[in-house]
From Swiss-Prot:
Protein name, as recorded: U-actitoxin-Avd3i
Pfam families given in the database record: Kunitz_BPTI
Species the sequence originates in: Anemonia viridis
Localization annotation: Secreted; Nematocyst
Propeptide positions: 76-82
Length: 82
């Protein structure tokens, strides 16, 4: 069991970004107007969008911090590595 857990953790790190983060932004057909964040694979950043409230996908986060954590994006405020 521990071996499997280690394997999946290494595999996740090795292959980079969570697959859900590669999904396109989906606003959805409803009109609720929730502020959400998604990972933009072109800019390699989490960005704000307005979510309609239904028929979205997993690339839809309540906070910028949650998006950055799940998608492996460093915060804009963290110091750059040399």
């Amino acid at each position: 069991m521990v071996f499997l857990l280690c394997f999946f953790l290494v595999a996740d790190v090795s292959y980079g970004i969570n697959g859900d983060c590669e999904l396109p932004k989906v606003v959805g057909p409803c009109r609720a107007g929730f502020r959400r964040y998604y990972y933009n694979s072109s800019s390699k950043r989490c960005e704000k969008f307005i979510y309609g409230g239904c028929r979205g996908n997993a690339n839809n986060f309540h906070t910028l911090e949650e998006c950055e954590k799940v998608c492996g994006v460093r915060s804009r405020d963290s110091p750059k590595e040399n």
